[in-house]
């Protein structure tokens, strides 16, 4: 199994780092977005990618621009969605013959599902969520989940 660094072009002026992990006999690929407080190399993200690899699933983890810049304030949705789309496009290039899925942890899951709800992510067959922030702590509401009705691919939550 290899873990290779990749560069993902988000737009004309911005790139982000990624980690492409592929087992020898991969049968699928998951684009995996990190949560708001920890980047792609966080122990949860690494453990998830390692666990998926032992089961034959390649992963492309990536940084959102704010995390790449060392900021604690998450990107606004338009930039986060563009980053997810760019990561998906990169995964298509890296694994052209594998079924593709997208998802993430918490903030990454929400940004991926919002991007999919706005316009289908190319070649993505389903979404995988490792936790999904339905509302901020101690502020129950459903605004963050309303877009899920617009997601037209299968989705699975892992809690």
Question: Model-flagged regions — what are they?
Answer:
Residues 1-7:
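Short, hydrophobic/aromatic-rich segments at coil-to-beta transitions
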Residues 84-153:
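Primarily recognizes the serine-hydrolase "nucleophile elbow" in alpha/beta-hydrolase
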Residues 158:
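Conserved small/polar residues in nucleotide/adenosyl-binding loops
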Residues 7-100, 114:
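Serine-hydrolase catalytic machinery in alpha/beta-hydrolase-like enzymes
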